[in-house]
From Swiss-Prot:
GO terms for molecular function: transferase activity; zinc ion binding. It comes from Swinepox virus (strain Kasza). The RING-CH-type zinc finger domain is required for E3 ligase activity. It holds the Pfam family RINGv. This is E3 ubiquitin-protein ligase LAP.
Amino acid sequence: MDPVCWICKDDYSIEKNYCNCKNEYKVVHDECMKKWIQYSRERSCKLCNKEYNIISVRKPFSQWVFSIKDCKKSAILYATLFLCTFIISLVLTRINITKIIDTSKNDVSFKLVTMIFYLLPFVITCISFITLIVYLYKYCKISAKNNTYDTIYEL
């Protein structure tokens, strides 16, 4: 009787050893083992506790596949907020602040309120930009994980 793969139960003719298991659990196809590790995310055999000889390889960045479903709705919201506040900041900074401050008499409170009014969009833009950078970093980490594949070798 020919040995059978313990994953797919098909006949198996080539002996490859990925762990220290004996008997029927030693026999497994290459493709079945790759799919098993990809599905289970296990790095060692559950029966004999031997670690598999796995090397994780990340695809080159030019071959990465990005998915919008990995991007959270809040990240899209922050990107939109950033663009809106950036545009508002550009429009408001085009107005000559010094002209407004100089035209007011020596009223310090008016100058202070005017400066706060014009600096607020800039501050909001900076905060939303930092938040956007954080979300982009998280998205890149998720994309890097999704664009990594494992290669398993015999012992």
